[in-house]
Regions:
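A short, proline-enriched helix->beta-strand linker immediately N-terminal to the Walker B motif
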Residues: 148-152
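Helix N-cap at the start of a conserved alpha-helix in ABC-type nucleotide-binding domains
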Residues: 165-167
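Conserved ABC ATPase signature
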Residues: 129-133, 137
């Protein structure tokens, strides 16, 4: 199963219960703002500890409260593309990509760097500073860095946020190719209904509380 997640999270006074069970290559997690979608992604990546539950991705148990399993974030091998991208502003694009490569586990099956650069059409951006990139370019670089880390799975948090129609279309085409060409489960959070309908083979709704 791509994603087998049943967790309870305590965020301040709010209690979030999430269940994601999907065999699909790309699963969408949707819901209103404040429902806790990003918190669920954080829990899957190992950045937030659930109060209870179990997290398994691609057949590997990452967290199980009853079995006392809680893998460290680096052992979970999540390719996490945050909503704000989080590129290193003091490193050129090429160095940001190299950082992703250094994070790859020695035993991980990695997609060749040049293949990723060609796929995401960022060869002309390698000498640029992150602050000079457009929103669409920034997202493409962030996805490339995540893929270079040899991820077990990808977490994409609002990748279409603030993109115009043309850049959103370009990014959609790239995510489609990643979904179809690579054996990497993808969990996508998006408020863009058209993109969810286009990309996701299964949609899970999180209402929060």
């Amino acid at each position: 199963m791509s994603f087998d997640v049943t967790v309870t999270l305590q965020i301040g006074e709010r209690r979030i219960c999430a269940e994601i069970r999907s065999d699909e290559k790309l699963t969408a997690l949707v819901g209103p703002s404040g429902a806790g979608k990003t918190s669920v992604l954080d829990a899957i990546a190992g950045l937030r500890r659930p109060e209870s539950g179990r997290i398994a991705v691609a057949g590997e148990t990452l967290f199980d409260i009853t079995e006392n399993i809680d893998l460290a974030p680096n052992r979970r091998r999540a390719g996490y593309v945050f909503q704000d991208a989080r590129l290193f502003p003091h490193k050129r694009v090429d160095a940001n990509l190299s950082y992703g490569k250094r994070q790859a586990d020695s035993g991980a099956s990695c997609i060749p760097r040049e293949e990723i650069i060609d796929l995401l059409a960022i060869g002309n951006l390698l000498r640029r500073w992150p602050t000079t990139l457009s929103g669409g370019e920034t997202r493409r670089v962030a996805i490339a860095r995540a893929l270079l880390s040899g991820p077990r799975f990808l977490l994409l948090d609002e990748p279409f946020s603030s993109l115009d129609v043309e850049r959103a279309e370009t990014l959609s085409l790239l995510i489609e190719r990643i979904r179809d060409e690579f054996a990497i489960p993808i969990l996508l959070v998006s408020h863009t209904a058209a993109e969810v309908d286009r990309l996701a083979r299964k949609t899970v709704r999180l209402d929060g509380g």
